[in-house]
């Protein structure tokens, strides 16, 4: 069972629709009991770091996420804010993140030539190849909307990078844990292939 975690921070319906187009069923839930039965977890999100962590805590989801992801090694895909919440902390807020990836979330500091947020289509380069990036071509294009990005303490966790004045990490990977800065559900064939990889192989 694929569980899309609904904690009030994103358009979960569009992710469910993409998964259906690939040929799989997913549930949208914030019920810890249903999440405990899932074989794949997706943590989407748009909004602020502290609001995301607060909502997860108030819904009683942090303990079940720790059990599923850390103890049971259930594959997890964090999307946009969901990727940020996998880290230890964010410049955007004061609360601690889930800490699944040894990393921090920081705000873009760019020249006037580059607008914040980084919005629109951009290319990714693969730092490593693994199950999530399988059969994706070099310089695949994805859709981004973000003002913050992730800095990994361990460079081995960097899966993809993207150029926006400077190079930044656009996807992370550690064992059963994956995070993408872009929105697969808005990225057409590239997003569908990545989501299919996560569901079938990760």
UniProtKB/Swiss-Prot annotation:
SUPFAM superfamilies: Class I glutamine amidotransferase-like. The lineage of its organism: Archaea, Methanobacteriati, Methanobacteriota, Methanomada group, Methanococci. One of its GO terms (molecular function) is lyase activity. InterPro entries: Class_I_gatase-like, GATASE, Imidazole-glycPsynth_HisH. This is Imidazole glycerol phosphate synthase subunit HisH 2. It comes from Methanococcus maripaludis (strain DSM 14266 / JCM 13030 / NBRC 101832 / S2 / LL). Heterodimer of HisH and HisF. CDD domains: GATase1_IGP_Synthase. GO terms for cellular component: cytoplasm. IGPS catalyzes the conversion of PRFAR and glutamine to IGP, AICAR and glutamate. The HisH subunit provides the glutamine amidotransferase activity that produces the ammonia necessary to HisF for the synthesis of IGP and AICAR. It catalyses: 5-[(5-phospho-1-deoxy-D-ribulos-1-ylimino)methylamino]-1-(5-phospho-beta-D-ribosyl)imidazole-4-carboxamide + L-glutamine = D-erythro-1-(imidazol-4-yl)glycerol 3-phosphate + 5-amino-1-(5-phospho-beta-D-ribosyl)imidazole-4-carboxamide + L-glutamate + H(+); L-glutamine + H2O = L-glutamate + NH4(+). Its EC number is 4.3.2.10, 3.5.1.2.
